[in-house]
Structures are given as C-alpha cells and as structure tokens.
C-alpha cells in the first residue's frame, strides 16, 4: 500500500545491499505492469511495507536543500548588517550562493508544476468517483442493486474520496511550504 492506504500491488522481490539495507522492491502492479521502487521510498508500518509517494520524497528533499541555502544567505545578510564581514566578502559569498538560489527558483517552479498536476489528477479522480457514487445511488433507488451491494460499494468509494482529500491536503501544505520566498528577491 502507499502512505494513503491505496493498494500498489504484490511484492515480487526485494533487492538488498551487503548490509541488508533495501535497495529496491519489485512490484506486480496489476494492469500497470511491473514496477521497481527505490528502497528509500519503502518504510514499514506495523510490519507492512508502505510506499512513500515520489512527490513527497522529492518535496522533502527539496525543502531540506532549500532550507540550507536560505539559512546561508540569511546568515550572510546578518553578518554584513552587523559589520562582521566587509561588503566585498558579502558580495563574494553571496554570488557564490546565488547560483544555488537560482537553481532553487527553477527547481521550485518545476516542483510546483508537478505538485499542481498531482492535485488536478486527484481532483479529477474524486470527481469521477462522485459521479460513480451518484450512479450507484440511482441504481439503488430504482432497485437495480441491493442494499448490501450499494453499502459496500459506497463505503469503498468513500474511502477513495477520503484518501484523495488527505493527499490533496498534504500536497497543498507542501505547495504552501515551497512557495518562493522573499529571500530570492532580496538577493537580486
């Protein structure tokens, strides 16, 4: 399962390094075919493997890297304002880290675009699920499906909607966290 409880597939094999650390996991993903996931995406919750979303792993790494760059630039600004370093040293070190911040700006735009596409995809899936639930309600109302079948299907569809809502909320939080900061503007 993924971290939202969705079934990913059946594990077909696990590759480890000489220390026993998981390097990759092979999964039969049904109609999506075979998939190989890197070991850093796999965690264990109550002895069950859980796949971390690729967007989550990438955005966490992005936020960590960006946080370090921001701290350096802010520290440089403080050192300069407190006259701990000269303007020449400030400019030299700022220029050195400016390339990293420029990369951040490009990477930030790409990351935001990827996360927005994921939100859109989940929203479309939720809309399709809502429409399907409407169809189920209609069939139930006219007697085409029994109470038991209707309740089971509706409950399962509700679970899908809850998972999507949770992931959209998580994506929105990450999007808020990686929105371009005033920091990049201050340096330019």
Predicted regions and their residues:
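Peripheral interaction segments used for macromolecular assembly
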Residues: 1-186
